[in-house]
Amino acid sequence: MQTSYVIFTDSTGDLTPALIEQCELQVMPMAFNLDGADYRNYPDGREMSPHEFYEKLRGGSLCKTSQIPISEFVDAFTPVLEQGLDILYLAFSSGLSGTFQSSRLAVEELKEKYPARRMICVDSLQASMGEGLFAYLVAQKRLQGAALDEAARYASDLAPSDRKSVV
């Protein structure tokens, strides 16, 4: 069934490229710094594979993450809004990153230019595979034909009831 919205999430959910495609998700890559070098966490591992990343951590490398900037949300959301579609963003836990807040600020900025479009941000309260499972479950609702409000309500109900983080 055709729905009139796109689901975005971020790469900290550790979903495979195949699952991302199957679920019709748009993924925002998170930035990280490892031993002084900056990278983006793309699901396809184009800048660093998960294997290499964890090998470096086991070897004593230090990693720092940074939230997705407002400008990157604006750049990612704008083409979708210009197509006349709405947005549901499923964010990395606000307890671990400022990314959720950045997404909300981007939405406030975009509402001025696209007042007829709906943009909903939901804090997953998750990280890693817990966040990935969260995004997968919400995406399944969308694929089953759930409208934006129904999918957002499902996501909001799901978030506080499952506070586990699978590592």
Where are the language model's segments positioned?
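A short helix-to-beta-strand connector/capping loop
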Residues: 3-4, 22-25, 114-118
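Glycine-rich phosphate/diphosphate-binding loops that line cofactor/substrate pockets in enzymes
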Residues: 1, 75-87
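Conserved small/polar residues in nucleotide/adenosyl-binding loops
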Residues: 166-167
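Residue-level detector of anion-binding/catalytic polar loops
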Residues: 26, 86, 147
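Short, charged beta->alpha transition segments
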Residues: 70-80, 105-107
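N-terminal glycine-rich anion-binding loop in soluble enzyme alpha/beta folds
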Residues: 6-72
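Active-site histidine-anchored catalytic micro-motif
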Residues: 83, 92, 97-162
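General beta-strand structural signal in soluble alpha/beta enzymes
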Residues: 7-9, 66, 89, 120-123
